[in-house]
A protein has these predicted regions:
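Metal- or metallocofactor-binding catalytic centers and their adjacent structured scaffolds
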Residues: 23-103, 107
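Structured beta-strand/loop patches that form or line metal/cofactor-binding pockets in enzymes
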Residues: 1-35
Length: 107
């Protein structure tokens, strides 16, 4: 299974929320969410997370979490990330776990 697309979803009625939907070549999707500073999170997900994740196995979520947290481009003043990255990574992580549950037929 490979990640084919990462979609961000926003709703004007819940303007601080961002949902992240990860699509795979097997038609299985995973949904995650995060809160606060939605425009920055959407930019981070599409500009940083998506290029890293596209084409990768979504079930290697521990590897992806570690790489996104410690990715050199995400370092700021010597620290791994800032709050936007933590929130974006959290939404990605939730979506990957959701995808794992769905691919395992867990309900």
């Amino acid at each position: 299974m490979k990640i084919t697309a990462i979609e961000t979803i926003q709703n004007k009625n819940f303007s601080n929320l961002v949902w992240v939907k990860i699509h795979t070549n097997e038609g299985i999707t995973g949904l995650g969410e995060t809160f606060r500073n939605p425009n920055a999170i959407v930019s981070y997900i599409h500009e940083s997370c998506a290029p890293y994740l596209l084409g990768k196995d979504p079930l290697r979520f521990n590897e992806h979490a570690d790489n996104l947290l410690n990715w050199t481009a995400n370092r700021y003043i010597g620290y791994p990330t800032r709050s936007v990255e933590y929130r974006g990574n959290s939404a990605i992580d939730i979506a990957l776990w959701d995808l794992k549950a769905k691919s395992s037929n867990l309900k």
